[in-house]
A protein has these predicted regions:
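Inter-Walker segment of RecA-like/P-loop motor cores
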Residues: 247-288
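Conserved C-terminal RecA-like helicase domain
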Residues: 273, 402-548
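Conserved helix-turn-beta segment of the N-terminal RecA-like "Helicase ATP-binding" lobe
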Residues: 234-259, 457-465
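Long, hydrophobic alpha-helical segments
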Residues: 588-698, 708
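ATP-dependent helicase/translocase motor core
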Residues: 1-225, 234, 238-249, 270-273, ...
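Conserved RecA-like P-loop NTPase helicase motor core
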Residues: 94, 283, 307, 315, ...
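Signature of the SF2 helicase/ATPase Hel1-core->accessory helical subdomain module
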Residues: 78, 280-401, 411, 556-613
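Conserved RecA-like ASCE P-loop NTPase motor core of nucleic-acid helicases/translocases
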Residues: 199, 224-232, 434-444
Length: 763
């Protein structure tokens, strides 16, 4: 019911306990809620070897600390405040009453971020979030941030209305600003009885946003039911499980309807609830009403004041079907969510008066957050596209016949690239359990089957292509793979598909100890989803992991897997919206080893580059931003500069041993920049170890430098490094300004001394 209570033992034990209400979700800036700000709260040490601390600023709601703020001076990186919070948690300073914290804010007054409260081991700096306004303009200085986020009512809303507990991850989630603006835009439109759509780029958390929209619409008295519509073709498994995970600790009911009878029962009930279903079940229900079935409920359901929330709104509902449902549900509002709207540039073919664009189908755009903005804000990663071609020919690209790409030799070249030339994309050198995954998408089910069979033949030693020993050193059982697609029961061509899928399932069962059959295809697909998503702890272990999944279209839309780093494409270029959707399977934020979403194409490189650029222009509102990573020449130049810089400082790894402690600190900074550029360079297919000879540099040299860096690295200097990076590195310069470096070091050490000064107890 949105009320938090605490259990208190009475002094007279015979009277038992009493539950006291302490905070109310909807009592915002009025009623029973009170707000306080406390500064410099002293927290005693929890362990003998620690020290007492003073916490900067805490916001209390009804006496409970719910938002904590750590402040630094402008000369210090805001990340230092983040690392200080992690240190305080390690020291046990956020226990007791402070365990009620929901939100951390870190700032150096000019740069501010927030993050959901969690234990130190779960706090990831990559999820620090900046605030933007409704037009996606950043508001990151402390004054602007405090006015927008930390004032009342927004601060209360942030921790009580715009937070979600993900039950599957056992984690608290705070919504990002663009999600909040979208939710509020839908609420405003619903009060005006207007429909509309939300354009949020793929990978930006549309499922969570749509969950909150569906949930919050029920707070509007005029709306009796919210129907969340998902696509029957493969999406409902992950989306529904996400909904159920969000709702497990919420105050509303989420119902998944497995059949039409359940749908009628849910919609005919008197309670307010969110119903998750497919458009096919809705149309089946309408048809049964016309046939005279469920007459007791038909009239009531037809007159419902209902809001439809449609995930992947173009795939889930066609204009024709939506028109029919609107004609039946006279009192309906429609809110579509899409990462790739259909514009006049890529509109559907005209069929009568049916909608051709997203605007025509759903109404006004209520909020937008494009791929360009998401990459700029760090909500998703950028893309890096590797245009490969297996065919060397004097013919012009457009003159190469399609049959050339059907040849077995082409397929072997593709698989050789995946198996032996994609180690960096898949993070294979990180070893067992830490590698990333990939999808190979092809044009048809027979083509997917052919790739599956050929890959099995390679692993059986029957082909000229082998998995290299270098790969096997890191992952002896690479690759673990499968194929996934929908199989119809009744289509004549599906008989062969079913036979092949039986063999696929047998292989899968043998690999993972499962027991799937064709009768449980949905269960198999769901298991593949979960194994690829790796969101449950058991999938962090190598014996439960997949490396590669072969698909046609399945998983290319609406599927979320942060560990998935690469999509390999061996098919003709897709439409702009489908390209962006497919690419966006790869650019979820995961960890520091995943810098980009990697896309590798294997045919028609010039045509692909043209189509991809057109798609990015369309979905970035006319500009690329940093959607595509730098090209090879740029990255090579950055590598050369950082290698020269580190050699100027320490010509050989052995020279690091003779550095002073202060110089070793600088070495850590320089090596991190070099390490980043070297890893980036190796992610290109153009890279070959032999090219290092030109620089009189080897992998062994790199490993020796890395050993030195690990020996002297200090985690708390990460903020210092990030501050230095913009100040001191320039790809057009050969050396670092040492005087500037010394000055910044002095500033940092002075700030560090002030931070570490222990609290003096009053006598």
């Amino acid at each position: 019911n949105g009320i938090a209570k605490v259990e208190v033992q009475r002094e007279d034990a015979s009277l038992g306990t009493i539950r006291l209400a302490v905070i109310w979700r909807d009592n915002i800036a009025a009623g029973k809620s009170s707000y306080e700000v406390v500064n410099q709260v002293e927290r005693d040490k929890a362990y003998p070897l620690d020290q007492d601390r003073r916490l900067d600023t805490t916001l209390l709601i009804n006496g409970l600390p719910l938002i904590h703020i750590e402040l630094k001076s402008p000369r210090v990186a805001f990340l230092d405040a983040f690392h200080q919070i992690k240190k305080y948690d390690r020291e046990g300073k956020f226990r007791g009453i402070y365990s009620s914290l929901q939100m951390f804010v870190v700032t150096n007054k000019v740069d501010t971020r927030y993050i959901a409260a969690a234990r130190e081991s779960k706090l990831n700096k990559q999820f620090l979030t900046k605030w933007v306004d409704k037009d996606n303009q950043p508001m990151i200085d402390l004054n602007s941030f405090a006015h927008e986020v930390l004032s009342i009512p927004r601060a209360h809303q942030m921790v009580m209305q715009y937070s979600v507990i993900d039950d599957s991850k056992k984690a608290l989630i705070l919504l990002r600003p663009y999600q909040i603006h979208a939710i509020e835009a839908v609420q405003e439109a619903s009060r005006r009885q207007e429909s509309g759509y939300i354009w949020h780029t793929t990978g930006s958390g549309k499922t969570l946003t749509s969950y909150k929209v569906a949930r919050n619409l029920l707070q509007i008295p005029a709306i009796q039911k919210t129907i969340f519509v998902v696509d029957r073709r493969d999406l409902d498994q992950q989306t529904t499980s996400s909904f159920l995970s969000y709702a497990a600790n919420d105050v509303i009911d989420i119902d998944e309807t497995d059949n039409t009878h359940e749908l009628v029962k849910r919609l005919g009930g008197n309670d307010k609830r969110v119903v998750v279903t497919t458009i096919q079940k809705i149309t089946t229900m309408m048809r049964k009403f016309e046939e005279g079935k469920y007459q007791r409920d038909a009239g009531k359901i037809k007159d419902l004041r209902v809001a439809f929330v449609v995930d992947e709104c173009h795939r889930a509902v066609t204009p024709q079907t939506q028109k029919e449902i609107k004609a039946y549900f006279k009192n309906s509002l429609w809110y579509g969510f899409t990462g790739t709207p259909i514009f006049k540039e890529n509109k559907r073919k005209q069929v009568g008066d049916l909608a051709q664009t997203t605007h025509q189908q759903y109404g006004d755009r209520l909020h937008e957050y494009t791929v360009k903005e998401a990459i700029h804000d760090g909500a998703v990663l950028g893309f890096k596209v590797d245009y490969r071609n297996t065919i060397i020919s004097d013919l012009l690209e457009e003159e190469i016949p399609d049959q050339a790409y059907e040849d077995k030799e082409h397929m072997l070249e593709v698989l050789d690239a995946i198996l032996n030339k994609s180690q960096q994309q898949l993070n294979i050198p990180k070893g067992v359990g830490k590698s990333n995954e990939a999808i190979l998408t092809v044009k048809s089910i027979p083509r997917a089957q052919a790739y599956y069979n050929l890959l099995k033949s390679i692993l059986a030693g029957k082909e000229r292509v082998k998995v290299s020993e270098r790969v096997k050193q890191h992952l002896p059982d690479f690759p673990k793979f499968t194929i996934t697609h929908s199989v119809s029961e009744n289509e004549e061509e599906s008989i062969g598909y079913q036979d092949h899928m039986k063999q696929v399932m047998e292989d899968y069962n043998q690999e993972f100890g499962t027991h799937f059959s064709l009768a449980d295809l949905r269960g198999f697909n769901s298991d593949v989803n979960n194994r690829l998503a790796r969101k449950q702890d058991k999938y962090l272990y190598r014996n439960e992991q997949l490396d590669l999944v072969i698909v046609v279209d399945r998983l290319l839309t609406g599927f979320d897997a942060p560990c998935l780093s690469t999509i390999f494409i061996d098919r003709e270029p897709m439409k702009p919206q489908h390209l962006i959707q497919a690419f966006s399977r790869t650019n979820r934020i995961n960890d520091s080893n995943k810098m980009y979403g990697q896309i590798v194409t294997f045919r028609s490189p010039k045509e692909y580059k043209k189509r991809i650029n057109e798609a990015l222009v369309l979905y970035s509102k006319g500009g690329f931003g940093k959607a595509i990573a730098e090209d090879w020449d740029t990255v090579l130049s950055q590598f050369e500069t950082s290698l020269k810089t580190i050699r100027n400082f320490a010509p050989t790894p052995n020279d690091v041993l003779g550095l002073s402690d202060r110089q070793k600190r600088v070495f850590v900074i320089l090596f991190r920049e070099f390490d980043h550029n070297f890893a980036h360079l190796k992610s290109f297919s153009t890279y070959d170890n032999e090219m290092l000879k030109k620089y009189d540099f080897t992998e062994e040299d790199y490993e020796d430098y890395e050993d030195d860096e690990e020996e002297y690295e200090e985690d708390k200097k990460v903020g210092f490094f990030s501050r230095l990076k913009d100040k001191l590195f320039n790809v057009s310069e050969d050396e670092i300004d040492q005087e500037e470096l010394e000055a910044v070091l002095d500033d940092y050490e002075e700030e560090e001394y002030e931070e570490e000064t222990p609290v003096k107890k009053k006598p």
